[in-house]
Regions:
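Membrane-interface helix/loop boundary segments of multi-pass membrane proteins
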Residues: 77-103, 135-142
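Juxtamembrane helix-loop-helix connectors linking adjacent transmembrane helices
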Residues: 12-77, 87-88, 92
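Functionally important transmembrane alpha-helices
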Residues: 122-186
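Membrane-embedded alpha-helical segments of multi-pass membrane proteins
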Residues: 1, 61-69, 77, 81, ...
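Membrane-interface helix caps and helix-loop-helix hairpins in membrane proteins
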Residues: 49-57, 111-120
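Hydrophobic alpha-helical transmembrane segments
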Residues: 28-33, 64-65, 73-75, 98-103, 123-127, 180-191, ...
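Small-polar-interrupted transmembrane alpha-helices in polytopic inner-membrane proteins
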Residues: 40, 97-113, 127-130
Length: 191
């Protein structure tokens, strides 16, 4: 049974390993920097526009590393499902890559419909970032880059800046959001 499943899904399993040229340390590091920069830029704009007020809380090096690894595992699990499994299946089943790119981005958005405080804008944002992650896999041939961008995005938003991620606030973050002063803008969605 296991051999049949493994043989049928070998191309999907290979997408996670080092066989694709894009799965390398360079793209992993690029993804981490890009995820931080994308979310950090939005947070900076919201902060400069006075849509959010952040205060420094604390940094505990051991917790920082443990939480980063936890976020990496969680984000990578979503990427494995959407870009590692569904994208790869759709890519092999349809000639047009748009089917795989849009199809798994839709699933990615649907997976987040149960989030606390979900709004039309947040689902649209998640769909669009799903397109971005899919394009990375398509053009860079790198699932690792998608792992890294997703991880850095979530970590930056939730752990570094203390903003809700998927509607969830965590007890440990480097900064804290003054929720009473937060307001919707083009750079930050309070919902």
């Amino acid at each position: 049974f296991w051999i049949g499943i493994r043989k049928r899904n070998r191309p999907i399993l290979q997408a996670v390993g080092t066989k694709p040229q894009g799965n390398n340390w360079k793209y992993l590091l690029f993804g981490l920097v890009l995820g931080f920069a994308l979310n950090g830029f939005c947070i900076l704009i919201a902060w400069l526009h006075h849509d959010i007020v952040l205060t420094y809380d604390a940094i505990h090096p051991l917790w920082f590393v443990v939480v980063f690894l936890t976020v990496f595992i969680q984000s990578s699990a979503e990427e494995l499902l959407c870009r590692g499994f569904l994208y790869q299946k759709l890519r092999r089943s349809y000639k047009n890559p748009v089917v795989a790119i849009v199809g798994n981005a839709l699933l990615f958005a649907l997976l987040h419909l149960a989030n606390n405080g979900v709004t039309v804008l947040s689902v649209l944002n998640i769909f669009l970032v799903g397109i971005l992650f899919s394009l990375m896999v398509y053009y860079m041939d790198s699932l690792w880059c998608a792992f890294a961008v997703h991880t850095a995005w979530n970590f930056t938003q939730n752990i570094l800046f203390g903003l809700p991620n998927s509607g969830i606030n965590v007890p440990y973050s480097v900064s804290k959001l003054d929720a009473a002063t937060a307001r919707d803008s083009f750079a930050y969605n309070v919902g």
